[in-house]
Amino acid sequence: DNAAGSSDVQEAYNVTGISDEQTAAQFLTYAYVLKLYMKELTHKGLLENAIYAMKAYADSKGCADLYNGQLLEILNNDELFAKIKINTAPFYVIMGDNTCHGVLRRFAGDITRSLIKKGQAVITSDGSYGMTVNLSDIEDNSLKGFIGFQSIVLFKDYFRKMKCPKYIFWFDNPMYFGNLFEGIDDKYYLLCQDRYYAEFIEEHFGAVNALQLPPAGEDAGWAANKDRPFDIVFIGACNYVDESVIKDEFQKEYYEYMKTHPNITFEQGLKELLVYKDFNIDEQKFLSLLDSLQDVCRNIVNYYRTKVLETLLAAGIKIDVFGDTWDRYSGLGKDNLIKHDAVNVDESLEIWGRSKIGLNVMTWHKAGMTERIANICLSGAVCLSERTEYLDREFNNYEDIVTFNLEHLEKLPDVVRELLANDSLRESIAQNAYIKASKEHIWDNRAESILRGL
């Protein structure tokens, strides 16, 4: 690809009077590359050869004057050179490992392909895209930025000292990560799936650029599929509700409080309980207390995930589930579980593409959106999800999504029965959901958000 963008080429026109845009860009690129590697070429005694080789090529194309003009322009215009260097600098994407069943690594591949599609240079940490380089080899070169997906490594001192931006998609509640965000500067962009996570990081760690940018989904080509043998599917694990993790009376009170207030965040619940008990503590003690409640909070998540499914199963609604964790389900309606082998990411997309309804229960993301929601919408199924502030704002209930309230789960079985009985309603919602998700919630959209931020 040409190093010069259209605006840079136009700037060159103003100097040279050239009207052939493609040719002008070509020779501006050659001139830029000469200046970029001038020190190395000089050191190896090859600069003169390179200049004459390019001049000979320009002569053969009848463009000698153009080449000379572009070379002089780039040699004498440091501002133009710097602009092109910034515009053509690569992103460095941290690919990660197979944590979370490979989902985070999948995200890294998705954003990489979207950036390349948009004309960006990309280097990946595993060498799967771009050139294979060591970080030590690029430290002194300009990067447009690092991109990671909950990449803890980007918070190490080595990266903190680097001046380029670090764009880090963040999915889990920051309360689980202690002081990881302490002392980060304005080169860090925390792209949180939940607005409350961004506010938490900003409030307690002083982050300047914590904002909401949820993950996106993949269109695997299933939206038009009419053969949907699965009525309602849930792709997720069956987790234990283990009340033995509750260590003292205060933790028990907190646990019971959150069970009866399922629409607030963990930190909101703690603040309310402290006010109710007339306890006044400083910020550090609050964070320490919240940190001590991690296991209790996970228990609350597991309690409501189980309760959502149990509500449907007990009402006689069959649910297709995947993975051997469901062998331990002992709640009501267990005979209505249809158990299958575990599935990977690609198989999950196919399952949703063969389903009428995809069920989603949040991991306590009260103002967020997950890739599961986007993937269900892009698969042609109806996404039936626990409501969040983000979904309330960005989607329309019974138009392109169907949401339910954890405080009123008694209504959920009738919602499912209506969707399964009313083909036209279900298909209309699914179609609208696909249109919306394909316009707003694919990785091309997230890549564009990062580029606009630059």
Region spans (language model):
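Non-catalytic N-terminal targeting/anchoring module and adjacent flexible stem/linker
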Residues: D1-R105, D110, S114-K118, V122, ...
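A short, gly/pro- and small-residue-rich
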Residues: F159-N173, F250-K259, R372-G380
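Nucleotide-sugar donor-binding catalytic core of glycosyltransferases
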Residues: G45, A50, Y57-P90, I94-F107, ...
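Short, charged, surface-exposed secondary-structure boundary motifs
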Residues: S6-V9, A24, M175-E182, F200-H204, ...
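Extended catalytic core of nucleotide-activated donor transferases of GT-like folds
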Residues: A4, L80-F81, I94-H204, E218-A223, ...
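Hydrophobic/aromatic beta-strand patches that form the interior of the parallel beta-sheet core
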Residues: Y13, I123, I147, Y167, ...
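Catalytic binding pocket for nucleotide-activated donors in carbohydrate/polymer assembly enzymes
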Residues: V93-M95, R106-K118, I123-G127, G183-D185, ...
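Active-site regions of enzymes building and remodeling cell-envelope glycoconjugates
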Residues: A3-I18, K163-Y167, K187-Y189, A207-L211, ...
